[in-house]
Design a protein with these regions (language model features):
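Flexible, processing/modification-adjacent segments and terminal tails
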Residues: 23-38, 48, 56, 65, ...
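Extended beta-sheet lipid-handling architectures
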Residues: 43-46, 57-59, 74, 178-180, ...
Length: 234
């Protein structure tokens, strides 16, 4: 494992030429974290859409609860409770959990949708971490993550795309799009469904890898108003 880690570290260091230096990468990631850490908790209303070949889930209204640093829960209005049960996460804060126990490595500059983004790779220092590497595409001017690609041991590689609006100053997106390979399927943390209505997943026997898509569009946030820990129980 140490040999693999060293190889990855050397590789991403070669990508840094012409972009950020390591100290700048650390400072940029700190700015992103500091912005996210302004949010101690929130309750948000939104709409959840899914496009997964083996699961039939209707578009629905949801309430999202978050409490710093890593408590996250989604509740649907139609009786289906969506609770954290491990796996991947649609919550950006989860990438920075662990008190900064990672190495930030600069990996160049890219242009995406006409916007220049700094690329930073986060390598967890703990060999017990499920995350192998996260690649962040950061809007340096506004300290916002526009895209994140994360490779895990348990659930393969997944991608998060984020769009921002009036809550950008808090680092909170108006829209999150979560893309993953259904062959390595494990629902994101906060999106493991309890089928309280009796509806079960519809599975597809096709073994060809397919992309799953989960989209959350936020209507509003109530930020730093206090949320009881009991909300995240059960």
């Amino acid at each position: 494992m140490k040999v693999i880690y060293t190889t990855v570290l050397l590789l991403v260091n070669t990508l840094a030429a012409g972009g950020l230096v390591a100290q700048d990468a650390d400072a940029l990631v700190k700015r992103v974290r500091d912005k996210l850490n302004m949010v101690k908790d929130y309750e948000a209303e939104g709409v959840l859409k899914t496009n997964v070949s083996f699961m039939k889930v209707p578009e629905s209204s949801i309430t999202v609860y978050y409490k710093n640093p890593d408590k996250f829960k989604i509740k649907k209005k139609d009786g289906i409770s969506v609770v954290p049960k491990g796996g991947m996460s649609v919550n950006m804060n989860s990438l920075f959990a662990g008190n900064g126990e990672y190495t930030a490595v600069p990996a160049g500059i890219v242009n995406q949708n006409g916007q220049q983004l700094s690329v930073v790779k986060l390598l967890p220092l703990s060999e017990a971490s499920d995350i192998v590497v996260s690649t962040l595409y950061i809007d340096e001017k506004n300290a916002l993550v526009r895209k994140a690609i994360t490779t895990t041991r348990e659930s393969g590689t997944y991608e998060i795309e984020l769009s921002y609006g009036k809550f950008a100053k808090w680092g909170l997106p108006d829209k999150v799009v979560f893309l993953f390979n259904t062959q390595n399927y494990k629902l994101p943390k906060g999106l493991a469904f309890d089928y309280d209505t009796g509806e079960k997943p519809v599975y597809n026997d096709n073994t060809v890898p397919q992309k799953g898509r989960v989209e959350i569009s936020y209507k509003n946030y109530r930020i730093n108003k206090g949320i009881s820990a009991s909300v995240f129980e059960g």
